Structures are given as structure tokens and as C-alpha cells.
Regions:
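TRNA-recognition modules of translation machinery and tRNA-sensing kinases, especially anticodon-binding
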Residues: 2-303
């Protein structure tokens, strides 16, 4: 049997057993073995948390006004998910519900709420830190995690619409933010080696919207603002981004009025880990039987 056949069979087995398919593409149930590995990854990432790092955990929704102010709506409207609800009188809502049996479309009665689905874990961090006042030039560090949503419906393994994102965020002087990002780039290569997965670390860009977005993506690569750690999950030709390392310059500093203690606009950076993608990459690399994984990998994950 060829390597390609083994790979295809393994991917199909992950999709049907380690993950459980649902009626929606990119929305899967997670099994006990999957969650065991997620737990190990979470602990491994936590072991690298710097002393003094603040820990924040968020639900999968956030303020719509906050997201609009952050610039996400302008840059990524095609990925956004909004929370809507039925509004009106009891009679009007009942009519919509009962009309469903007659083939009427009840979603016409939906109205947007003040909530959206969180697209990135770090978005809720910046206004919280800004509200506290100036930050030291040496930086404020935050460990943040959230379930996130991006409207990327796909049958491709690892391309989930709802997923868990863990991030370390740095807010401080420009040189502090850059040094933080560079440190995590190097550390991520060590982590990937420790996990026994093949990888490449490359300059990257975000999927900005529209024609103007293509120019933004080019500028992002040219300025080396974003790097991704890629692991070949579905294929060598189109590896999956499982970690990213981003330098936002003064974008969030200007947006939220973040200042360092010398009065300058704060710069920000983050190291982001796609926990579900990393877990899928581990099963794709080492097989479905966790007990048969290399001892060094099991030791790293404490499983």
C-alpha cells in the first residue's frame, strides 16, 4: 500500500472516529482521545507561560461594537458570524414558528443582537488592558483562550468553522513586541520538534477581503508582520497553518488608545495556537492509537 493510500485512510479515519461529523461542514464533535490530546497540548503551552502573565478566558461571543471598532468588519467581513434572535411580540414570534410547518422561512423574523461570534481570542484583550491605563515599555503579557468562529465552510480536515484558539499576547514598546514575537517563533519550532511533526515556518498573510485586501496581504508579507508554522495534514502541497506569530505594529494601540508609560503608542504582538488543528496534525502524523505514539511525544503531552 502506498504512502498516499495510508495517508488518505488515516485522514478518513480521523474524520469518522477521532472526530464526529455533523450536518454542517467544519463543525465536528470531539471524542475522548481528541480531548485527551487537546489537554496535553494545553498543558504543554501553559508550561511556557512567562511569570507574571495574566490569564483570561472568554466565551465564544463578544460585543459587536467592540469588533467593529477593532477593524475586523472592514478587513474580514466575509468571515464574520453574527448572533441573531427572534424579536417582536409573542404573537408574531409564534406565527413565525408555526409558519415553519407550512414551509415559511422563519429566519425572516431574525434581528441582529449586540453580539457577534468571536473571530480571534486576542480581540477582547486590548480594550480591557487599555481601560487600566498606561502599560510599561517592558510589556504586559496575557494568556488568552476562546472558542472562535470563522465562516469558512469546508470539508477539508482542519478547516473548522468553530475552533479553539490559545494565544500569548504582548503589549508594550515596539522593540518589546518584536522581541516577543521572535522569541515565540523560535520556541514554536522547538515545540513542533518536541511533538514530532514535520513543519515549515514561513512568512504569511491574513485572508483580507476584496481587491484592496490583496494589497494589504502583499504589504503584510513584505513587512514580515505575520509568520505561520505549517504542518502537512491534508497534503505536502497545501500544508495547514497550526500556529501564527503576528506583529500588529500600532494598529491596536491606536484603536484602543493603548499607551506605554512614556506616552508613546503601544505596539502589540501575539503567538496563536490552533489547538484543534495541532491535535489533528498529531493524529495525522502519529496515527489514531495514542498509546502507540513515540514515547517522547507522549511524554511531552503527559499522556
Amino acid at each position: 500500500m502506498s504512502t498516499a493510500q495510508v495517508s488518505t485512510e488515516r485522514l478518513e479515519a480521523i474524520t469518522s472516529s477521532i472526530l464526529q461529523p455533523t450536518a454542517a461542514n467544519g463543525v465536528q464533535g470531539r471524542t475522548a482521545p481528541f480531548e485527551e490530546v487537546i489537554g496535553g497540548l494545553t498543558a504543554l503551552i501553559t508550561s511556557h507561560r512567562a511569570p507574571g502573565t495574566e490569564v483570561l478566558r472568554f466565551p465564544p461571543v463578544m460585543s459587536r461594537a467592540l469588533l467593529e471598532k477593532s477593524g475586523y468588519l472592514k478587513s474580514f467581513p466575509h468571515l464574520l458570524g453574527c448572533v441573531s434572535s427572534l424579536t417582536g411580540t409573542e404573537a408574531s414570534i409564534r406565527a413565525l414558528v408555526e409558519g415553519r410547518a407550512a414551509g415559511q422561512d422563519w429566519v425572516d423574523g431574525l434581528a441582529a443582537t449586540d453580539l457577534v461570534l468571536t473571530p480571534a481570542a486576542c480581540y477582547q484583550v486590548y480594550p480591557i488592558i487599555a481601560a487600566r491605563g498606561d502599560v510599561p515599555r517592558s510589556g504586559v503579557l496575557v494568556d488568552v483562550e476562546s472558542y472562535c468562529f470563522r465562516r469558512e465552510a469546508s470539508s477539508e480536515l482542519g478547516r473548522m468553522q468553530a475552533f479553539r484558539m490559545r494565544e500569548y499576547v504582548c503589549i508594550g514598546a515596539p522593540d518589546t513586541a518584536v522581541a516577543f514575537r521572535e522569541k515565540w517563533k523560535a520556541r514554536a519550532e522547538q515545540l513542533a520538534t518536541q511533538l514530532g511533526v514535520p513543519f515549515t515556518l514561513v512568512p504569511a498573510s491574513d485572508p483580507f477581503f476584496g481587491r484592496a485586501g490583496k494589497l494589504m496581504a502583499v504589504n503584510q508579507v513584505e513587512q514580515a508582520l505575520k509568520f505561520e508554522l505549517l504542518i502537512p495534514v491534508n497534503s505536502e502541497e497545501a500544508p495547514t497553518a497550526c500556529m501564527s506569530f503576528n506583529y500588529h505594529q500600532d494598529h491596536f494601540g491606536n484603536t484602543w488608545g493603548l499607551r506605554t508609560d512614556d506616552g508613546a503608542v503601544a505596539h502589540t504582538a501575539c503567538a496563536a495556537f490552533g489547538l484543534d488543528r495541532l491535535t489533528i496534525a498529531l493524529f495525522a502524523t502519529h496515527g489514531l492509537d495514542v498509546d502507540a505514539w513515540p514515547p517522547s511525544v507522549r511524554e511531552a503531552l503527559c499522556i
